Amino acid sequence: MILKNAEIFDENFDLVKADVAVGNGKIERVGQNLEGADMHDFSGCVITPGFVDIHIHGCVGADTCDGTREAVSKMAGHLITEGVTSFCPTTMTVPIAKIKKVLSVIKDCMENPPEGAAVCGANMEGPYISAQRCGAQKADNIRKPDWHEFKDLYEGCGGIIKLVDIAPECDENHEFSEHASRFCKVSIAHTMADYGQAVEAFRHGVTHVTHLFNAMSGLQHRSPGVVGAVFDDSSVSAEVICDGFHINPAVLRIAFHQLGEDRTVIISDSMRAAGMPDGESELGGQKVFVKNSQARLADGTIAGSTANIHQEIKNLISYGVPLRQVIKSATINPAREIGEANKIGSIKVGKQADLVVMDKEWNIVSVFKNGKLNKN
């Protein structure tokens, strides 16, 4: 199959006019004037790598913590329609027994893939966070970071955990981060840490920060906070929710400028209300109320998002964030964070043919997963 006459983001993320040849689920050739059977004319369109969402709790009424294959399958089937070709189902701060069950379901979905977006591993948001900055996480289920407990979880699920969150001020002698970082990404999240504590965490294995600005200390001129520590350390990547609600658009522009094009990771952080009408929903065992697509707990606390990666890409472009950085932040950067950049995340010969075709207004025209056109 040949995808012809479009502009593409090549393996260096330069926007060029080129054709893409796909076969056996892989990208076989990229170049000018390619010929072959089954040609698709995408004149006037732009082709990007498939989007990668490494932090998503749920959508269309399903949630990772439902702990069922049906829930993850429903998520996968919906996400592909929004251009997401790979994702990490993300747990909440729920009891350890529930986390074990959810991890087993995610493992099954990796080994026996449902239709739609591919499940690339699990993201553990909690339970090793701060009760003082828990946000929409249920405080009753918060636990002190326990390396041995996490090791049992990791080995018990066959090593599918790609990210695990901690509040570093709760990690005594940095034992958890030093050990866990040998197996997966360790990320700061839901924390009361100050600048100095974040810097120390980065020295002991933490290389990632969850939903930058949200549920952490912000940047002030006399108190740089976790945000300042991230800006200050080029080895740390940061997730960013780009719905324009969690973070003001001007602050998004500043953050993307400061972090540069290789450290920003667009996430949805969406919950089961995403893709659904406004109304009452649920997240991590707590009631959520969605009004004007904004999700909050009864006390007004922001409770996840109802956004999706494609929508956030369009937002960032409209905010004036450089196009190249926007696309990298939705594709190769998240793929790199979960150790999948050798397979997905860029349009490069030999990689999976996960591709999104958009028109010049950035509306999705077609989505290809492993070279197959999504029929939805």
Where are these regions (language model features)?
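C-terminal cap of metal-dependent C-N hydrolases
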Residues: 6, 336, 346-376
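Alpha-helical scaffold segments that flank or form the walls of functional sites
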Residues: 45-46, 54, 64-117, 141-156, ...
